[in-house]
């Protein structure tokens, strides 16, 4: 300022004075203009009066800068050496101050920054006598730029806030164009975080478009979701991946999108790979994008195809539980690979009945083959305490018919072959045993009755003991422990010198049969994958029928002693193969041996298979069983949730044995003799055995396709018809016309009867015993069911001859037929279908821990650890 301080003083007296007052007039004009603008004309007149009465030639240019209104805007502060108070000017107009010329109350102090000691200037003395204190120095160019930048940023922030308010109302471009951007009520709703307001604004379009979210709106909602763990409510409104990692990936995509077009492009790409929608129409549109047909020209045809896929009854599939955390993968590529073939290419419906079958897709997203038969949709299921229970049982991509599972099934099935041989032994052996020309000791009819009836009684004892054995020794070790006693029992019979040794051998064999019949289905149920559990689970029954057939054929050529020696040789290969297979992974988990369980699963599923998801499911299931278990397991059987599956298993065992099957098997030769058939009795038994064997293999092909209940229906109807026809034949033979020319009829009825029994009621009760019984009571409940089965077997075989004596053969067959008729209604009303379901799914359904999705739509989800 020193260069401009005394522009009027540089000349001589009058000239200099005149030159100095011209800038004063200019400055006074500026002052008047500014003070008048703020409504303070009185202050101006006071300044003018003071100047006119003063005797000074000092120019105001020595005091004022050219533009004193560029001072930065700061909050006003009191000068430490001044008591002058100022009047605030407009926010965008910096004030002006004349400290020596104005009165204290005229105007307020200017909003300048407080001066430091160094910044304070000494009073200036001009040519006059009045001392003037100068104003602070003018702002630098840097301060001016900062001031203007702050103003620009404030304006930009205000514009962005207005833009966000507009964008929050825009769900799509169409809906945004139809709305009034100046609607203040809509702006208030956009700022609201209330769920009802959110639903009201978004429900009209949110689930109807494949890319139906605005750039900023979904980002805001994603932040809300990640902060509050409120994923379920968000999932019902917006199209976001079910896994946390996918949601974070979407958030990154949104942040990186620099324009709306780029946002829609990345959004479509993301949805095409990870989209999970509760609205099937949305996902179907995404399917079109994946398949390269994103145009709407064929929309009507697409809608018709979609309805056919969604609502066709044959496309009903089974529910499965999904663990959201387990769906996370190490990389986006892994995620894409593991999910694209079974998760992204079809609709997710809140009602499992409307979920369509999965399609096997190629890399381009096109349908490559037939429907994947065993694929399952992902449906949330709820536990009995009302909280979501999330477990993982994804459709496996591991090979199913691998040799290790087949080897395990064949190994235990050889034990079933021994069981079948031992069970059928009395039918051909008693014929030669009662012959004194062959046997060195006398076998009375009463003793012969006990030879046939003691084995079921011993099976009852073995069934009771088998429950604790499989729990404490393990499934495999229990089965293995029966091999040597089978050999010993057959040797006792083969070397018998009296009836007592025969009875002892039969009792020991029956005890082992009771244990084996309990442990074999449990072992297979816990080792074989659900997709083939029905097929491989029937192998023990098929091999049991082979044992029966082998006994009948060998009995035609051997006496009872040689037949027993053959029975002693059969357990040897069974004993060798049992050493090659592992214990069940489920039993290892129940004993806390996680590493052993992992090795067993790797052996059963293959070394290249991913067994971790299945192992986690087993561990969670065992943890639930441990939390709910009690010390007294037998008391657990009486609980309502456990008694239901147990009663179904007992009912199946009851109707299996009361169909009369064991009476027919044990007394086949005698029945054909009484019927007066022209066919040799031994030949008839061989024919019955062959039919029994073939029918079981037919059942193995049908059980995983037709289901358990369908085969039970067919089995019941076939047995009802043949038993009533047999009863009519024997009634006519005893009381009616001559039926000797119908000697073929008993054999035909027996063949159809055995065929029907072997299709359903023969193998399925044992298979379902290992499926429907809960894990925590499986050992004790299977023990009770097995003991009950052998009790019924003992009653039927021991009383069959007495029934014939009392009511005749026709009465006995009619009684069995009536029981089968009742059993048909039992199957219809109470027996569940277990085809293709995991043991955990079956257990939840049997124990009543599954609810419909519609009944739990408002249940708060589990928290996510992120």
Swiss-Prot record:
Glycosylated residues in this chain: 437
Region described as Disordered: 1-34, 67-212, 282-311, 335-357
Bias type Basic and acidic residues, positions: 143-152
GO molecular function: sugar transmembrane transporter activity; trehalose transmembrane transporter activity
Domain of life: Eukaryota
Annotated Low complexity bias: 110-133
Function noted in UniProt: Low-capacity facilitative transporter for trehalose. Does not transport maltose, sucrose or lactose. Mediates the bidirectional transfer of trehalose. Responsible for the transport of trehalose synthesized in the fat body and the incorporation of trehalose into other tissues that require a carbon source, thereby regulating trehalose levels in the hemolymph.
Protein name: Facilitated trehalose transporter Tret1
Organism whose genome encodes this protein: Drosophila ananassae
Organism taxonomic ancestry: Eukaryota, Metazoa, Ecdysozoa, Arthropoda, Hexapoda
Name of the gene: Tret1
